[in-house]
Amino acid sequence: VFALSIQPYINSSIIIQLLTVAIPALERLARDGGEEGKKKIQSITRYATVAIAILQAVGYYFMMKNYSLLEQDGIWVALVIIVTLIAGSSFVMWMGEQVTEFGVGNGISIILFAGILARIPNMASSMVTGVQKWSAIKAGTLTLDSLTSAGYTETQAQSYLDSALSPWGIVLLIIGMLLLIAFIVFINDAERRIPIQYAKRQVGRKMYGGQSSTLPMKVNMSGVLPVIFAQSIASLPITVWTFIGIPKEGTVSYSIYNAIDTKSVIYMVVYFIMIIGFSYFYSSIQFNPVEIANNLKKQGGFIPGFRPGQPTVQFIQKVLGRITLFGAIYLGIVAICPLIVGKVINNGSLAIGGTSVIIVVGVALETVKALENQMLMRQYKGFLE
């Protein structure tokens, strides 16, 4: 029922946000429409979600048909499967919106968070299996010959043996994951603060202004969105290929399939480039240097050493470009590092994707902050005190 999960909503959000930049009418609606404009865009996103869910549900039906997973087939069976998948995806979208409106934090992020945590038992099981393989290899009971005699091909047997993990390998994986989480937490809170000075002005007998402040610019301004969207687009060819059927070994199609597989080097390079591109795209949407400079000018503020107006805009754009580049490279490295580890140890089930790690850490931090704010609003002590 929930096989499509929240993916149609994520894909529709990508499309609508790209169209918001490309279509002037949508851009005006997002910029000048206020709360009503946001509701209209949200409504358009819902309709787009249903449309994408229909396409993906049809794809899932044909995938099950190609792999002979259906005991019965026919127009009514197809209709029931497609409608059920669409209903499940729509329900997940509705549930996420309810959590956002009445709960704590972003509902869609929390659903993704829960889905990622649900995979941890499988990862732990893979670790145990990997250690058992390693022990059997050391004891001499698991060899290439024993696997080939059991019906494995030589390639399959070698791949099976390569997925073995030593206890020290598990320890290094856990330490690496903890260091990665600590790095994500550090970068998530890192920011560049631009000093702001406000000119003094006299109103009647009172003197106003003269104080100093800062303009904070987060290093990872766009959050996890570039990674989510880049992953959705980069994995689209493989998803489509899975729907129509994986090609047979030894064919040209199979070679192309392997070349763009999510474990291939080509996929990692394309994925990394897309993350950088989406990071710049979202930074330009969320932070407008011209608007910031105009607001500072209206409030009598200025950046020391730069005149109000175009010089201020150019300085903010320069700082924004540097921060965005650093944040984009950080996101790219964090996203592909677990993929590289999974490729090296030949055990993809152990490598929770960098996307997943960023989502888990980011959602956890945002939820803690949201709970802190809720408790402080009710005059209770902080959540961590």
Locations of the language-model features?
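N-terminal cationic and glycine-rich segments that engage phosphates or anionic surfaces
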Residues: 1-385
